[in-house]
Amino acid sequence: MKELVEVIAKSLVDHPEAVEVIETIKEDAIYIELKVAQDDMGKVIGKQGKIAKSIRTVVKAAASKGDKKVIVDIK
């Protein structure tokens, strides 16, 4: 999941070198924290959060084969 989020985020931003993805696996869920440069926040979130929602939807679909819930947090 980490690699998927990283590829998507790097394709959206102007500063791909600043993209950082941290994956934390717990009993009940997989937590993915996406950090981007402050200038790129708007590009990753999108108008009314549409791009952020799309990223979460793609990750959820990719994780549907597993038994854990995936939570994507953008910072």
Regions found by a protein language model. Name each.
Residues M1-K43, K53-K75:
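RNA-contacting regions in translation and RNA-metabolism proteins
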